């Protein structure tokens, strides 16, 4: 939540440095905290090495734009948990593994318990184990089988209530961590994507975080309004373009049954697109060894922050960053996690040398319907989605039906994500009329500017639905 890089001090002591503007940065302040009058200082930098990796199309607002939180943890604390619910092939039974990492300041004998309840709070599973010492932490995994489970999907996003209980050496309850989990299975069979045994159809949208009055500092009410709008208009999927969103958003998608393409904070289109031409001689990260750890760290941040969210069906490696060994390494990272999700990345399309090692999909942006058909009619290798289509700038959206027809014609075509959900424009007082008006790039003496190019939403910046939404509601509704 700091754009674009930061140094941190506490009481004059240097604590650390962080990049990656859209995932949490955590620091241990314990050695430097005083009982009173602590001074936490953040030095924010507009330009840093992160600038090469954060070239998204949006307004530049440098500074702190998400919550800053101070946490105190108990002596026995759950540092990390990974819930892995599995839906078996019979679509009736399942299993859950719960992997835990615990810090224990004084106690060496810690017991971890796992409790699973249904929506009505009936206890379905209760199991515990003694954690083992591993690399200055206590670790352990609990595995359970379930004869019957309710499925999670867009039509019925059924979530179970999971709890991890930690007990100290003396038997006292040290910590309880609740989490809601769901059972669903996404897989590719004969080049077709299935969710819970049924062909997956994506009626999706790309969504930037935006508020016309506060920019990227959005609140819970903004998120609730967006979820409500999507459900009302038959939108079943969202791509977090082109960075991880605020953490509450993923919980809301879990609850609402919105399928999520969770995108890593990476875009470097300026390094390989020059005046519209594809010219990758200066591409970052490409195959440059010095950039590999930086992009892998961003992939890790994305995965570790959101790995427990049922709504995430796809990990996306980033946006418009061409292809090379470093992007391939990101694909390997996600694939090795074996978490049952699929991996997405569009820009491998520009470099076919990597088409077999990057992305589980053939994925394009703004391909014409006939271009989609050309691929699907000529020995296609992968299922096809449009990660961006129907660029809704001005009075657009008239051609949506031409794309939707392809869903019925080709099993390997799974739909796509409209560009995009909300206009990025800023509400200001008109100096002449005194009325609230929306302003775009170039309206703030910012030169050069891309003018209204950030206004491509199916809702205006104040979240009022555009006329184009009628087209979305109708055509997307055909595939509910």
Regions inferred by a protein language model and the residue ranges of each:
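Accessory beta-strand-rich segments of carbohydrate-active enzymes
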Residues: 1-80, 106, 244-247, 259, ...
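Active-site-adjacent substrate/metal-binding segments within catalytic domains
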Residues: 4-11, 16-19, 50, 75-84, ...
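Short strand-edge motifs at loop-to-beta-strand transitions and within beta-strands
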Residues: 23-27, 136-142
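Short glycine/proline/serine/threonine-rich loop/turn segments at secondary-structure transition edges
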Residues: 33-37, 146-159
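Non-catalytic, glycine-rich low-complexity segments
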Residues: 41-107, 180-185, 299-302, 451-480
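Substrate-binding clefts and catalytic carboxylate motifs of secreted carbohydrate-active enzymes
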Residues: 60-63, 296, 313-315, 332, ...
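Beta-strand-rich binding/interaction modules
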Residues: 93-131, 140, 162
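Aromatic-lined carbohydrate-recognition surfaces of secreted/lumenal glycan-active proteins
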Residues: 269, 317-319, 337-352, 415-420
